[in-house]
């Protein structure tokens, strides 16, 4: 049964291309080596964005855990875009069994935990980034290792708690997707619903209401499991599915993320950027009428519930 579940859960694509100069390697506790890249805000390639505030400040760092059928080459342009428009650094890594680490062994739940631990250790020990300035961002299957790490740092007496947790199209657990189980059974994978209850950091949930891969009911149930004081207003978007919230609704998506970062993360980090000004806010008129940037696959009309569209103090 375990191998069948893993085959369903992990479906790495053919390794995509990414310049070797952009990656470095991390050693995991299980003996595997995984590739990663680190995008520094304002220092990407030959392009330089003007700093938004004083150079004495330090950007927040997103630790990005990608979705199932992706690898580093697939997500590099998107992570660069996030860095630019959120004013953050981004560290992303591949799971063992993915991309250039495909020959390192198969992807498993336990190995994913070791992989994100290695990435986090690099941020904390090598780059010496304070935990409060690290925000975990997991999308789809990436919400599994992200919830694990957020829980581990919250429960550990030897580590500081991370600054925040962003879960994009999360699930309660793998068995709850496949079998619609109501509890964590033996052999289940990535029990996010169990981890998230222990997390002591502000949590933002993002989900399309028409998601047919992971129904929005998973996010709605997770939201109720989060400790009340750590519930950030979620972003639940009408007419959006599993893969297009961040693409078709880019303006809404970035505004909501920037509001979350400003209210819950930067306000608690005196040495971080105090108030980024995302360029997406000064969008062209065409985009306001439904125009979709080049990176998007398609456009769509939408509506957002009042609870998730406004950053009020209700949550």
Please describe what each predicted stretch is.
Residues 1-46, 271, 293-296, 300-304, ...:
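An N-terminal hydrophobic leader/cap segment in hydrolases
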Residues 58-67:
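Short beta-strand element of the alpha/beta-hydrolase
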Residues 67-82, 103-104:
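The serine-hydrolase catalytic nucleophile loop
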Residues 121-126, 131-179, 198:
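Primarily recognizes the serine-hydrolase "nucleophile elbow" in alpha/beta-hydrolase
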């Amino acid at each position: 049964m375990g191998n069948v579940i893993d085959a369903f859960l992990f479906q790495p694509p053919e390794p995509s291309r990414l310049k070797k100069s952009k990656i470095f390697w991390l050693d995991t506790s299980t003996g595997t080596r995984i590739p990663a890249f680190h995008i520094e805000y304002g220092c990407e390639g030959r392009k330089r964005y003007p700093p938004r505030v004083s150079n004495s400040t330090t950007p927040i760092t997103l630790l990005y855990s990608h979705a199932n059928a992706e690898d580093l080459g697939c997500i590099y342009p998107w992570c660069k875009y996030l860095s630019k428009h959120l004013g953050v650094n981004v560290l992303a890594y591949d799971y063992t069994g993915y991309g250039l680490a495909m020959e390192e062994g198969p992807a498993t739940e336990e190995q994913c935990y070791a992989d994100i631990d290695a990435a986090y250790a690099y941020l904390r020990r090598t780059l010496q980034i304070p935990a409060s300035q690290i925000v975990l961002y997991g999308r789809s299957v990436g919400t599994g290792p992200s919830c694990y790490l957020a829980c581990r740092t919250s429960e550990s007496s030897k580590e500081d708690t991370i600054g925040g947790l962003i879960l994009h199209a999360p699930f309660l657990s793998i068995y709850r997707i496949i079998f619609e189980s109501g509890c964590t059974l033996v052999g289940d994978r990535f029990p996010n619903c169990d981890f998230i209850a222990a997390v002591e950091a502000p949590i933002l949930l993002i989900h399309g209401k028409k998601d047919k891969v992971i129904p929005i009911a998973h996010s709605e149930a997770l939201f109720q499991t989060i400790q009340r004081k750590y519930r950030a207003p979620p972003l639940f978007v009408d007419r959006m599915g599993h893969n297009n919230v961040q693409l078709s609704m880019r303006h809404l998506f970035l505004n909501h993320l920037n509001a979350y970062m400003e209210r819950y993360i930067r306000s608690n980090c005196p040495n971080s950027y105090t108030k980024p000004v995302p360029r997406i806010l000064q969008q062209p008129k065409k985009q306001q009428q439904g125009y979709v940037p080049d990176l998007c696959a398609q456009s769509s009309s939408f509506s957002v519930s009042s609870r998730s569209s406004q950053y009020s103090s209700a949550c």
